[in-house]
């Protein structure tokens, strides 16, 4: 499968979303190359329950890119990356960002390595390990997590990776009042942003938590 086999509507949806998010349309080509690989591998390996390419654009690509403005440089660990979300879209749109995709599932990690190879993503590495077992303490300015765990669960398994004053960017649906209240000491909510994801209905929030 190649990019040309994707419908014009898929490309149009992505271009529209990038325009709304004020991101360069130059990212269309690598993002569609990633989407093509995801669709192909998903047939065999069931990497995501979403099958429709247009829905993938909205719920995977644009949803991930909605947080791009909040992290553009430094080192980032994407915990429980799954099929590379939000890590790969962020790496594509932020070439100066050094991204480590942390994924313990073997088939998903193999897919991620293939994406990195085929797209030539020199700013991306893959660690096939659980976050709590990653021996890179205090190495990252940022952590991302999308549908991984509660805020407390995320900082418990991955907090050691962050430098002092580093930030966790946790992607959530509804405003997570109870999760915020359960954060341990030395983790401070810096901001909660309501995300506007093009063509996506329903609530999306980004919780930015700073390590003190």
Swiss-Prot record:
Record keywords: Cytoplasm, Methyltransferase, rRNA processing, S-adenosyl-L-methionine, Transferase
Transferase keyword on record: yes
Localization of this protein: Cytoplasm
Gene3D superfamilies: Vaccinia Virus protein VP39 (3.40.50.150)
GO cellular component terms, semicolon-separated: cytosol
Superkingdom classification of source: Bacteria
MF terms (GO), sorted A to Z: rRNA (guanine-N7-)-methyltransferase activity
Function: Specifically methylates the N7 position of guanine in position 527 of 16S rRNA.
Family from the record: Belongs to the methyltransferase superfamily. RNA methyltransferase RsmG family.
Protein name listed in UniProt: Ribosomal RNA small subunit methyltransferase G
Organism: Xylella fastidiosa (strain Temecula1 / ATCC 700964)
Gene: rsmG
């Amino acid at each position: 499968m190649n990019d040309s086999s994707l419908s014009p509507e898929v490309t149009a949806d992505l271009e529209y979303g990038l325009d709304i998010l004020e991101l360069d349309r130059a990212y269309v080509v690598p993002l569609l190359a990633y989407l093509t690989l995801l669709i192909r591998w998903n047939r065999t390996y069931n990497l995501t329950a979403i099958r429709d390419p247009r829905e993938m654009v909205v719920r995977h690509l644009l949803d991930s890119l909605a947080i791009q403005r909040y992290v553009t440089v430094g080192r980032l660990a994407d915990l429980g990356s799954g099929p590379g979300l939000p890590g790969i879209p962020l790496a594509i749109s932020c070439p100066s960002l050094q991204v480590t995709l942390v994924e313990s599932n073997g088939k998903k990690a193999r897919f991620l390595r293939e994406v990195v190879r085929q797209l030539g993503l020199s700013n991306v590495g893959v660690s096939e390990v659980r976050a709590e077992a990653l021996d890179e303490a205090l190495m990252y300015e940022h952590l991302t997590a999308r549908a991984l765990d509660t805020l407390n669960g995320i900082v418990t398994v991955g907090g050691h990776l962050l430098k002092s004053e580093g930030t966790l960017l946790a992607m959530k649906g509804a405003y997570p009042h109870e999760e915020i209240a359960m954060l341990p000491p030395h983790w401070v909510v810096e901001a909660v942003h309501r995300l506007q994801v093009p063509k996506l209905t329903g609530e999306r929030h980004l919780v930015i938590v700073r390590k003190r």
